[in-house]
């Protein structure tokens, strides 16, 4: 046993001696031109340093300062988080290395300060909390040259890093760290103001990161408008005037109007962007998890918007999981990508939670939860590329649209599914949409997709009376917004509940309470709607407008109830083809006491069977229907149980 131990010790000593023989202690900056393993024990200063391809450099007390390092497949070994590349750039690439941001001179000293008596109009807080620290712009630009082209690198930020606003960046406040053509990069554990742009990269993991803005979260005021910036407005009683003398009191279309752009709101640009540089390149294998994004224009972007999508490569194979988002100017998650999974993400205070845009297909959003939204999620494609938007779905998610995010002169929508591949169905399953408004708005399923299908969903609409006595309203609409090649788009609501709640009390000759339009056709010519359950409570007026321009409506095995609706009596302003089966209608209809308004068309077809109606319904149709086009079977008054045949 003792001899064996001596043998092992001798072998280990031999290996160490051989390794020592291979490792060269660097004497000067020009002594590393051959391939080898180099130990740097002192500071090396030079404008250019050539290191043999495939070499390894080990820092052991020294560092490199002010040099452009030329090396391919360079392995870097650092013992700790000290600065070893001081103002250096790499021409080449590194491999199989484990590095920290501080190895490149980045200072992890970002901190939060307070400024009292912040007088910006409309802000709910009087004290501004803003971030400051050492400007790491130059150091980050250097480290980006090391990560670009790298393979098998573990990169740890290990701290909070400030980056100053760059005047040349205009509205996009901080600079980006641009990393190109890297493979197998793991980036983790840090807080940044700067955004990161990955171009033509593969197998990228970003985890346990925080991407923040120049200010801590605050509810920035109205920042979008569809009007002209030349006129003054009021939002919640606060006056906003035309910007003069460099003041920033106005929102000009999408971008904040002021001398420093979005800096005045404390917003930073996108957190992370994954993109391509040409049609021949790709960005694949993306994994973003356990990250937080706040006070950004956007959070995670998979592929940037283009004027010509034929000039881009593919962004594909992305997972965004267990991430949180707060206070975004546009979308927490936006994409022009394929084969994407978004899972267990949450956020608040944003224009729109998720944008599944042009070129996006095979996208699954599951377990998303967002509140304080102005819009719901969106699938939308440029018409010329509609055939590349397909097989997208949202599951087990919830979205609350409550207009805390002010947009002047614009309506909201619950879901925008504009354009998609003909024959494809955009599916929303096991999800809840909540809509709150005390002003006006449209809870819209806005579609030009060939088919949109809601399964086991809940659509909740809550209307509040305004303090000035005027009437808020909601239009529950399914309509075509853009020209489409699909000839008969269809919206299906399967086992889906609709709840509309208001504070109803009507007075003679005047309607001063919330009212709702249901399924109104706004520009739509052909539609199919299949409804499960709809409950309307406390509204002074209801117009259920399934217009004749809609091709087909099917209501089956449903519970339809309307309460406190004293103005309008039609349940259904019928489409060309109406089928009602196994359905119960409850609630007082009011003025007209009629279930269906017969359309003024020649080739309509209506069928009502195995259905019960409220006692207030005296007849099914406003005019005697043409029996050649109408079938009534087993329709009864739910109170008297008597049949209704006309």
Where in the sequence are the language-model features?
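Extracellular beta-strand-rich solenoid/capping regions of secreted or surface-exposed proteins
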Residues: 34, 44-56, 64-81, 112-119, ...
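Sec-dependent signal peptide recognition
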Residues: 3-8
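Extracellular/surface-exposed low-complexity segments
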Residues: 87-96, 630-646
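Short glycine/acidic-rich loop motifs that flank beta-strands on beta-rich extracellular proteins
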Residues: 66-70, 164-173, 192-200, 214-223, ...
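Hydrophobic h-region of N-terminal signal peptides that target proteins for export
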Residues: 11-18
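Feature marks extracellular polysaccharide-active and adherence modules
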Residues: 41, 60, 72, 102, ...
């Amino acid at each position: 046993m003792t001899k064996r131990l001596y043998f092992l010790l001798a072998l280990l000593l031999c290996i160490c001696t051989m390794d020592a023989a291979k490792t060269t202690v660097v004497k000067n900056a020009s002594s590393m031109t051959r391939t080898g393993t180099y130990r740097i024990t002192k500071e090396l200063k030079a404008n250019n340093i050539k290191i043999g391809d495939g070499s390894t450099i080990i820092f052991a007390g020294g560092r490199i300062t002010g040099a452009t390092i030329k090396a391919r497949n360079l392995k870097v070994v650092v013992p700790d988080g000290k600065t070893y590349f001081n103002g250096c750039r790499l021409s080449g690439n590194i491999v199989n290395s484990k590095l920290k941001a501080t190895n490149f001179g980045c200072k992890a000293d970002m901190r939060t300060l307070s400024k009292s008596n912040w007088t910006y109009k409309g802000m709910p807080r009087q004290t501004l909390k803003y971030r400051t620290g050492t400007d790491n712009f130059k150091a980050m630009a250097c480290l980006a040259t090391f990560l670009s082209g790298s393979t098998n690198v573990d990169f740890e930020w290990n701290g909070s890093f400030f980056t100053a606003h760059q005047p040349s960046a205009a509205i996009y406040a901080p600079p980006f760290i641009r990393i190109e053509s890297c493979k197998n990069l793991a980036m983790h554990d840090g807080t940044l103001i700067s955004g990161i742009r990955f171009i033509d990269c593969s197998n990228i993991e970003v985890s346990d990161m925080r991407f923040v803005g120049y200010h801590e979260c605050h509810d920035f005021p109205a920042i979008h408008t569809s009007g002209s910036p030349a006129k003054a407005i009021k939002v919640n009683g606060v006056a906003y005037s035309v910007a003069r003398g460099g003041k920033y009191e106005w929102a000009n279309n999408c971008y904040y109007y002021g001398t420093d752009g979005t800096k005045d709101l404390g917003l930073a640009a996108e957190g992370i962007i994954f993109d391509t540089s040409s049609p021949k390149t790709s960005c694949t294998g993306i994994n973003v998890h356990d990250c937080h994004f706040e006070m950004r224009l956007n959070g995670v972007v998979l592929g940037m918007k283009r004027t010509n999508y034929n000039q881009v490569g593919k962004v594909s194979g992305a997972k965004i999981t267990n991430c949180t988002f707060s206070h975004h100017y546009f979308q927490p998650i936006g994409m022009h990508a394929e084969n994407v999974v978004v899972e267990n993400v949450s956020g608040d205070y944003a224009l729109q939670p998720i944008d599944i845009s042009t070129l996006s297909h095979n996208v699954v959003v599951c377990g998303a939860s967002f509140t304080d939204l102005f819009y719901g999620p969106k699938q939308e494609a440029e018409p010329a590329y509609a055939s590349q938007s397909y097989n997208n779905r949202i599951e087990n998610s919830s979205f609350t649209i409550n207009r805390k995010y002010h947009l002047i002169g614009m309506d909201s929508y619950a879901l925008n599914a504009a354009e998609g591949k003909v024959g494809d169905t955009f599916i929303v399953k096991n999800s809840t949409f909540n809509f709150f408004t005390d002003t006006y708005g449209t809870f819209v399923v806005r579609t030009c997709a060939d088919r949109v299908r809601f399964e086991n969903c809940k659509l909740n609409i809550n209307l509040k009376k305004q303090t000035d006595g005027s009437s808020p309203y909601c239009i529950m609409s399914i309509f075509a917004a853009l020209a489409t090649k699909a000839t008969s788009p269809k919206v299906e609501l399967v086992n889906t509940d609709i709840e509309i709640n208001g504070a109803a009390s009507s007075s003679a000759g005047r309607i001063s309470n919330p009212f709702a339009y249901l399924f109104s056709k706004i520009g739509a010519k052909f539609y199919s709607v299949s409804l499960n359950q709809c409950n309307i409570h406390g509204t002074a007026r209801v117009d259920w407008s399934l217009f004749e321009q809609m091709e087909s409506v099917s209501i089956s095995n449903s519970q339809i109830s309307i309460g406190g609706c004293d103005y309008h009596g039609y349940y259904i302003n019928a489409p060309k083809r109406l089928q009602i089966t196994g359905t119960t209608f409850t609630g007082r209809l009011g003025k007209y006491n009629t279930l269906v308004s017969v359309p003024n068309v020649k080739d309509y077809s209506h069928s009502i069977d195995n259905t019960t109606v409220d006692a207030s319904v005296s007849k099914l149709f406003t005019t005697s229907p043409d029996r050649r086009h109408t079938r009534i079977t087993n329709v009864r008054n739910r109170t008297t149980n008597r049949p209704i045949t006309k």
